[in-house]
Regions:
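N-terminal pre-transmembrane cytosolic regions of membrane proteins
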Residues: 1-130
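Structural beta-strand/beta-sheet cores of well-ordered domains, especially the beta-sheet scaffolds
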Residues: 30-32, 84-86, 174-176, 308, ...
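Short, well-structured alpha-helical interface segments that form or flank functional binding sites
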Residues: 74, 83, 212, 219, ...
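Exposed alpha-helical structural elements
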Residues: 12, 46-50, 189-193, 244, ...
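N-proximal short alpha-helices
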Residues: 3-7, 14-16, 24, 183-197, ...
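Short acidic (Asp/Glu) and glycine-rich catalytic loops that position anionic groups and cofactors
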Residues: 30, 201-202, 299-302
């Protein structure tokens, strides 16, 4: 069968559907994912060079690679390049079968000394997952609490009851820890649950990057709104001399537009990351576990208000920009009317002098 000439990017677009398959994970097993912020494209090469240290002598990865899978001893390693961050995922197909010591990370000793601490870029999220076999009901909350060192745990059954997830969602030495009690998972399904938990934690942190920006911007917006109100009060009171007001308004508009240019993409990214968090929660198909607050309910109470603050700052900034534009139009209109009045007066004066002559 002979087909027309392919679009140059067709194969790449078709392969995108299969570019990032879920890794399979065994039970018992352990997973650690570390996300570091991507500062510039130059760091891509640094990541690939760092990964090459795990397999000396292996063929070099393509400079344009967006993902890479390799092995270091008994540990499987997966690297992915995203728009704003890198993810490094480490998987062990062996692990404790009991609660005691299930979150120990001795299996990471297979990595070269100091290699993990030297990952390129500042860390934004680290997620540790332990998968334990549990053919019956999950342990009572009281027996799980000592593992986390916290009495406040959240979790639920997931994957239509095939597993139970428990966490405290606290950052302990920079790591968020999850326990997955495997009731009836196969390796592929366990891998999907692990990936969703990793993405839930990572994208939650990425979404929160704009919260400090929103908090700072809210204070600035209050000041800028007061300045606009003061300018409009002077506009109403003034009978002439709109040029100084217009100059001040132009300066205010420039400051607001500068802030929008600096922070607009950050707020937009937050909304995209928030959407991913919501989708990952929905995909886990939660079921209630007695004694545990559901993960979605916990995030709804804690994470959602932060997201709404970011959305409010973005909307307030856009509204202020629109108000400034309307105010500028009013000032320009009045200035044009005044210039027209002066021109008419000048013409009338000239006509009068001509008549006297």
């Amino acid at each position: 069968m002979k087909l027309p000439t392919e679009f140059a990017q067709r194969q790449r677009l078709a392969d995108e559907l299969h570019a990032r398959p879920f890794e399979s994970v065994a039970t018992p097993g352990a997973v650690l994912s570390v996300a570091t912020l991507r500062g510039s494209p130059a760091e891509d090469a640094a990541c690939l060079a760092h990964l090459a240290l795990l397999q000396p002598g292996a063929p070099a990865a393509a400079a344009t690679a967006t993902h890479l899978s390799l092995r270091c001893g008994a540990v499987r390693v997966r690297w992915e390049r995203h728009t704003e961050f890198y993810s490094f995922t480490f998987i062990s197909d062996t692990g404790p079968t009991e609660l005691a010591g299930c979150l120990d990370a001795d299996w990471l000793n297979a990595l070269p000394a100091g290699w993990l601490a030297a990952l390129p870029g500042p860390m934004i999220a680290a997620t540790q997952i332990a998968l334990l076999p549990c053919p019956g009901e999950p342990p009572h909350v009281r027996s799980v609490a000592p593992v986390f060192g916290s009495e406040v745990l959240v979790g639920n059954r997931v994957a239509d009851g095939a597993a139970t997830v428990v966490t405290d969602l606290r950052s302990v030495q920079g790591v968020t820890r999850f326990l997955v009690f495997d009731h009836a998972l196969n390796r592929r399904r366990a891998g999907r649950i692990a990936q969703r938990l990793i993405e839930l934690d990572t994208y939650r942190m990425m979404a929160l990057l704009s919260l400090p920006v929103a908090s700072k911007r809210m204070g600035e917006l209050a000041t800028e709104e007061e300045q606009l109100a003061s300018l409009m009060n002077r506009f109403r009171a003034a009978s002439d001399g709109d040029e100084p007001l217009l100059a001040e308004l132009t300066d205010l508009a420039a400051r607001v537009e500068h802030a929008m240019a600096n922070h607009g993409s950050r707020f937009s990214a937050t909304q995209a990351y928030r959407g991913i968090v919501d989708r990952r929660l929905a995909e886990m198909r939660e079921q209630l576990v007695p004694g545990l607050q559901p993960l979605s309910e916990f995030l709804d109470r804690r994470f959602r208000p932060a997201m709404e603050s970011c959305a409010a700052a973005s909307a307030r900034q856009a509204q202020l920009s629109e108000r400034i534009a309307r105010a500028a139009q009013l000032l320009q209109t009045r200035a044009e009317v005044e210039r027209e009045r002066q021109n008419q007066a000048l013409l009338a004066s000239m006509d009068k002098r001509q008549g006297l002559q």
